[in-house]
UniProtKB/Swiss-Prot annotation:
Function comment: Catalyzes the conversion of 4-hydroxy-tetrahydrodipicolinate (HTPA) to tetrahydrodipicolinate.
Annotated protein name in UniProt: 4-hydroxy-tetrahydrodipicolinate reductase
NCBIfam families xref list: dapB
PROSITE patterns: DAPB
Record flagged with keyword Cytoplasm: yes
Gene Ontology terms for molecular function: 4-hydroxy-tetrahydrodipicolinate reductase; NAD binding; NADP binding; oxidoreductase activity, acting on CH or CH2 groups, NAD or NADP as acceptor
Database matches in PANTHER family: 4-HYDROXY-TETRAHYDRODIPICOLINATE REDUCTASE 1, CHLOROPLASTIC-RELATED, DIHYDRODIPICOLINATE REDUCTASE
Localization per Swiss-Prot or TrEMBL: Cytoplasm
Catalyses which reaction(s): (S)-2,3,4,5-tetrahydrodipicolinate + NAD(+) + H2O = (2S,4S)-4-hydroxy-2,3,4,5-tetrahydrodipicolinate + NADH + H(+); (S)-2,3,4,5-tetrahydrodipicolinate + NADP(+) + H2O = (2S,4S)-4-hydroxy-2,3,4,5-tetrahydrodipicolinate + NADPH + H(+)
A matching Pfam family: DapB_C
Organism: Rickettsia akari (strain Hartford)
Amino acid sequence: MINIGLSGSTGKMGKTILARIDKFKDCKISAKFNSTDDLDDLNNFCKNSDVIIDFSTPEILEKLINYALKHNTKLVIGTTGLQPKHFKLLEKAAKTLPILYSANMSTGANLLSYLAKKATKILDDYDIEILETHHRNKKDSPSGTAIMLAETIAREKGLNIVFNRGNRPRSEKEIGISSLRGGNVHSIHEISLLGDDEIITLKHEALNKNSFVIGAIKSAIWLQDKSPALYSMQDIYNYSLQKQL
């Protein structure tokens, strides 16, 4: 039985994990942590966990990593809004611990990333723009998923990522991200490839949070026998594909 520590247990994602965990017979929630707890409580939290799923806030990440290193506790990080300093901490810790980070753990969003990478190879002379839509209370903008998608495409094509274009014209070597906030929208991401004569749009819409938490729990299980490294959801899919071949 895998003991999973849940960081961010009182948030929307945490509550959904608690509601879905019984569907998985080989793991259980062994410890919980939320933003009202004392940060030093992370010591026992990590001690009582084989792996931690973190859907909390960037502010606790450094202490969470420190205690995870102390107790050799694996990490699945789904918290968004991380800054470059946080990724440096993850990269350093991943030399000692297996860590999986993803801004979006749903199968559909990661398939969208894969398809976008393939499409931009074929449609080499098309302009690329990303539009993301979320509920009115989402704190970070653009979304972590939009940044993930943009970075995947930018690496493939050597583009610059632009968040706020303002009143200047679009340059040739850029990919733009635009954000909408309103209503109770869970998550919509659209990648538009715009040519002179046609437009192709790739779209993923999450109807609820179930796909995110199922991906997170599966990631925690997958991470159990892995060596120290910083993994992504693509590593899980690549590993599964290799086993099938």
